[in-house]
């Protein structure tokens, strides 16, 4: 017995104590102590009470002075009847009574965890990572091999084991990343995906984010081969229960959030550079935007190719004093219910990109071609483009009628030029003109912005200076500004009214209305090749004297797809001719509803046509 006395005090106490069960609830410790004192001296007797209710649980512990007395109590008092119940006396150190014995205080034996010291759940991932990293490669490979065999032989048991021990599943997942069996990004997705697993054993399934199962994982988490003999790495079960666990060992960059950003719309390939005087809405309707800086790109109609000179200045003019964009010829005013977009045809172009005060020059039919090399005061503001099949040349010779007839742009013209096809003009936007006749979306042939061409380019009252060549009324600038086919400008002059000098199609095909402001062959202000506006261009003297020169194609110097004498009448020509006829057929009431500048321009236009008709 002396050998027992030198044992650990807690263990010795457990050997000297007995477990007493099936105690009546009304019994007191004093009554029980008296009963157990029959076999020997009782050091203490303690009943176990429920912590929540405070009621006795029906069992307790009796401590004797020595182990022999405790053994005697188990032999003699087991089955003793007390208050109608038979008391059960057993060894307090048995496995069944260990938990109850702990309530007695430090007398309970201290059992070391085979997994190491407990660890805070928040530090568990880092601890597991260190444990996995400390394993030699050979041992890690052997563990993974054994786990594979375990899954192959007993899949369900392996799954249950990993579900009940999430720290083990995490360690295996980490080992796969270390051994490069699994991509870190895939491991992260497995860890963070939300999976609700039905517990196989009630109360056993744990979420890693709450706490480590049982004893927390420690540096010695990954046991040797003897522990993982029947374990293997399951590809699917591992992530379960790891969904909400904080992962500190995997770099944050692996956590790649899936961001479904809305792709920004790509740039419209054929966009007017900068803030043009006008732009087309996606539906093709012209929106008056003269003088408004920052106008976005303009979509084209029917796949027309719009070419522009990147070096051209971007006119950014201030808003007009009234705060509203300058009004166009037909329905550009915000208060016009008809909503047309034909341009205003009066006023000079200011370099800053908005319409200035009207030019008070003589009417167009009185203007004579001046041999000046300066820019015309009636520059067009620049519509986006015209027909891509046509190119503008520099009209240095006599204008050729579409049917091959020579014509004098300043006054005389063949009477046949007044035919319907001779009256077509790029001034009329053929794609936006409404049947009311008021919305002719001026000067746009399949994509030309009506407002893009400063209507003051069509100023019929101002003089039309003719530049360096017998252009017969066409307004030539000092040098050819070749906008065709994306070519760079060939002249020093940049048309301030065009949103980006070289807006292709800036030339309004004046195949018929060869107006003073309309630079010949699509702002033939020096040969600006309107990339498709050639041929049928508004020759700036075309309305002078002779008025509307019918369907004139720039002959001679015209490097376009039209040969100098070509007399074909295309469907586009017929459409444009019909459009200009609609403009000319506007009633007096319709014209009266227009702003003063536009109304005056329409009247001047009709007057020129009447005079030219009478002359023919």
Curated annotation (Swiss-Prot):
Q: Where is the composition biased (Low complexity)?
A: 223-233, 319-331, 550-568
Write the record's keywords in alphabetical order, separated by commas: mRNA processing, Nucleus, Phosphoprotein, Repeat, RNA-binding
This protein's GO CC annotations: intracellular membrane-bounded organelle; mRNA cleavage and polyadenylation specificity factor complex; nucleoplasm
List the Gene3D superfamilies.
Answer: 1.25.40.630, 3.30.70.330, Transcription termination and cleavage factor, C-terminal domain
Query: Domain RRM, which positions?
Result: 16-94
Outline the segment boundaries, as ranges, of region: 9 X 5 AA tandem repeats of G-[AT]-G-[MI]-Q: 505-549
GO MF terms, alphabetically ordered: mRNA binding; RNA binding
Q: What is this protein called?
A: Cleavage stimulation factor subunit 2 tau variant
């Amino acid at each position: 017995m002396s050998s027992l006395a030198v044992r650990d005090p807690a263990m010795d106490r457990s050997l000297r104590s007995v477990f007493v069960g099936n105690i009546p609830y009304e019994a007191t410790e004093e009554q029980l102590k008296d009963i157990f004192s029959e076999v020997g001296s009782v050091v203490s007797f303690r009943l176990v009470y429920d912590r929540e209710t405070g009621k006795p649980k029906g069992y307790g512990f009796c401590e004797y002075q020595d182990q022999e007395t405790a053994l005697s109590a188990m032999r003699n008092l087991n089955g003793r009847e007390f208050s109608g119940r038979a008391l059960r006396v057993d060894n307090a150190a048995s496995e069944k009574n260990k938990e109850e014995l702990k309530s007695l205080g430090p007398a309970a034996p201290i059992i070391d965890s085979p997994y190491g010291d407990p660890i805070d759940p928040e530090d568990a991932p880092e601890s597991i990572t260190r444990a996995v990293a400390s394993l030699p490669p050979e041992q890690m490979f052997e563990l993974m091999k054994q786990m594979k065999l375990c899954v192959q032989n007993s899949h369900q048991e392996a799954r249950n084991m990993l579900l009940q021990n999430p720290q083990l599943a995490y360690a295996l997942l980490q080992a796969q990343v270390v051994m490069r069996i699994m991509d870190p990004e895939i491991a992260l997705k497995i860890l963070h995906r939300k999976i609700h697993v039905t517990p196989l054993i009630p109360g056993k399934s744990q979420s890693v984010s709450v706490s480590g199962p049982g004893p927390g994982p420690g540096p010695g988490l990954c046991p040797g081969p003897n522990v993982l003999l029947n374990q293997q790495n399951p590809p699917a079960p591992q992530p379960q229960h790891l969904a909400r666990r904080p992962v500190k060992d995997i770099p944050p960059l692996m956590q790649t959030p899936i961001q479904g950003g809305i792709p920004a719309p790509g740039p419209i390939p054929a966009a007017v550079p900068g803030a043009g005087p006008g732009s087309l809405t996606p539906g093709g309707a012209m929106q008056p935007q003269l003088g408004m800086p920052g106008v976005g790109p303009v979509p084209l109609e029917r796949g027309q190719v719009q070419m522009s000179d990147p070096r051209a200045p971007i006119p950014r003019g201030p808003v007009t004093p009234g705060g509203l964009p300058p009004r166009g010829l037909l329905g550009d005013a915000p208060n016009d219910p008809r909503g047309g977009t034909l341009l205003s045809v009066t006023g000079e172009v200011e370099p800053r990109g908005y319409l200035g005060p009207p030019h008070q020059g003589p009417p167009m039919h009185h203007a004579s071609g001046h041999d000046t090399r300066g820019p015309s005061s009636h520059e067009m503001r620049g519509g986006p483009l015209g027909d891509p099949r046509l190119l503008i040349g520099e009209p240095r010779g006599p204008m050729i009628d579409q049917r091959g007839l020579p014509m004098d742009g300043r006054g005389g013209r063949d009477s046949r030029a007044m035919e319907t096809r001779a009256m077509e003009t790029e001034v009329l936007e053929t794609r936006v003109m409404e049947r009311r006749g008021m919305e002719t979306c001026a000067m746009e042939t399949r994509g030309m912005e009506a407002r893009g061409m400063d209507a003051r380019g069509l100023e019929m009252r101002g003089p039309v200076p003719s530049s360096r060549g017998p252009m017969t009324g066409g307004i030539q600038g000092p040098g050819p500004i070749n906008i065709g086919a994306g070519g760079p400008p060939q002249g020093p002059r940049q048309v301030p009214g065009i949103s980006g000098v070289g807006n292709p199609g800036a030339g309004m095909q004046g195949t018929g209305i060869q107006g003073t402001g309309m630079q010949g062959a699509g702002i033939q202000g020096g040969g600006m090749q309107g990339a498709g506006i050639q041929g049928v261009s508004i020759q700036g003297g075309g309305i002078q004297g002779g008025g509307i020169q019918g369907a004139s194609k720039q002959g001679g110097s015209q490097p376009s797809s039209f040969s100098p004498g070509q007399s074909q009448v295309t469907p586009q020509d017929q459409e444009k001719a019909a459009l200009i006829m609609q403009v000319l057929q506007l009633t007096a009431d319709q014209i009266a509803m227009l702003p003063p500048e536009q109304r005056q321009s329409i009247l001047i236009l009709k007057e020129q046509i009447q005079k030219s008709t009478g002359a023919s």
